[in-house]
Amino acid sequence: MAGRPHPYDGNSSDPENWDRKLHSRPRKLYKHSSTSSRIAKGGVDHTKMSLHGASGGHERSRDRRRSSDRSRDSSHERTESQLTPCIRNVTSPTRQHHVEREKDHSSSRPSSPRPQKASPNGSISSAGNSSRNSSQSSSDGSCKTAGEMVFVYENAKEGARNIRTSERVTLIVDNTRFVVDPSIFTAQPNTMLGRMFGSGREHNFTRPNEKGEYEVAEGIGSTVFRAILDYYKTGIIRCPDGISIPELREACDYLCISFEYSTIKCRDLSALMHELSNDGARRQFEFYLEEMILPLMVASAQSGERECHIVVLTDDDVVDWDEEYPPQMGEEYSQIIYSTKLYRFFKYIENRDVAKSVLKERGLKKIRLGIEGYPTYKEKVKKRPGGRPEVIYNYVQRPFIRMSWEKEEGKSRHVDFQCVKSKSITNLAAAAADIPQDQLVVMHPTPQVDELDILPIHPPSGNSDLDPDAQNPML
């Protein structure tokens, strides 16, 4: 190693002085290497240093830079304003808290100006820490294979250091644990989670299990719940990929979160607009029901009817029927609403489905909604010789609603009449007169044995084919 002089040492900070020493005292270069001179200034003898020990200075400076970078990154992550969930594998909140303390302590140790101790074999003492960290990471890897996944949600204002373990709650949703700071729910007190962990937490009807964990949001997937937790921090729910809007809507309704355009953000605008249209159609039809439809239903009920047939016409439609020749399809029993807005509302099939669901919720029966032809005015009259004249009306396609509030519509009158048995009614023969003659023959019952006993005995009138034993059934 010291067989020939080196013109320049990369570890030296003053190359001119080194050249001067090289020309003035050339013999010392053959006695001491550059590495031994550097170590002699530090006061440590490394004459028997191995190759690993010789490169320890470079590794030590590199480790210092990495540890300082890690400490800066960790402090930057703790003060980050965005609430990003991090995935950790822990067995309990207490163990997780101890692991975080050990990590903070280990990250702050290399950044101290105190020099590290060298082992007799030339290795640095931080190698033991790295081996412990590697063993810990291997144990964490085994936890990952076990399938226990924890999402930690913290409040960005307080920071991770100010949150104690007792101030966190663990929510179990779809076999996934979410470690959440309950203070994030106070921003939305009208939601289900805001009521559970808000000011009235002592009156909460949901109790934790034996491990102190809360099982909430039954039937909601972990991916959907993770997106909903972002709502308590940012006020916006971003629909994850692969999750349908109806599924997200059902989860929002379960957790009492308003489903509005300012709350939901997704790529499928068609599905989002469809859900928003359903909400708007429900509110609009409830208004139409109270203002336009219900008065006509009351008028039908006051006249003794138990059903109502309503036709929706536009404001420009004109109904002009001939009093002498009215339509012959029963349209005279229909109620009419002149409203172009309601006509446009029922033009869409989705709106008719929403209206039908609202009427079912209000207790009505036999609900039919659709579009049918309705006669407006008389076009011409065809007169037939010796018969009734035929009237031709102009028909327009308009929406209609038919509903009933009859309570006994499920009973069959035909079955009730068949079950009646009475011998005191004498007009049954008159009622049976409407039955065809061929059915009367089939309906006559055959004589029974006990009826033959009371029948009068008549002498045989030349009927030789009759069996004599049949005259006396007792024989």
UniProtKB/Swiss-Prot annotation:
Biological process according to GO: positive regulation of phosphatidylinositol 3-kinase/protein kinase B signal transduction; type B pancreatic cell proliferation
Matching CDD domains: BTB_POZ_BTBD10_GMRP1
Tissue: Ubiquitously expressed. Highly expressed in adult brain, testis, aorta and small intestine and weakly expressed in the heart, lung, liver, kidney, pancreas, spleen, thymus, prostate, ovary and colon. Down-regulated in glioma.
BTB domain sequence ranges: 167-241
Pfam families, per database record: BTB_3 (PF16017)
Record localization: Nucleus; Cytoplasm
Positions of region (Disordered): 1-143, 455-475
Annotated spans, Interaction with AKT family members: 146-475
Coiled-coil ranges from the UniProt annotation: none
Biased composition (Low complexity): 108-142
Keywords noted in UniProt: Cytoplasm, Nucleus
Main location: nucleus
Comp. bias (Basic and acidic residues): 57-80, 97-107
GO CC, one annotated term: cytoplasm
TM segment ranges: none
Keyword Translocase set for record: no
Self-association and partners: Interacts (via C-terminal 330-amino-acid region) with AKT1; AKT2 and AKT3. Interacts with PPP2CA and PPP1CA.
The protein's role, per its UniProt record: Plays a major role as an activator of AKT family members by inhibiting PPP2CA-mediated dephosphorylation, thereby keeping AKTs activated. Plays a role in preventing motor neuronal death and accelerating the growth of pancreatic beta cells.
Name the UniProt record assigns to this protein: BTB/POZ domain-containing protein 10
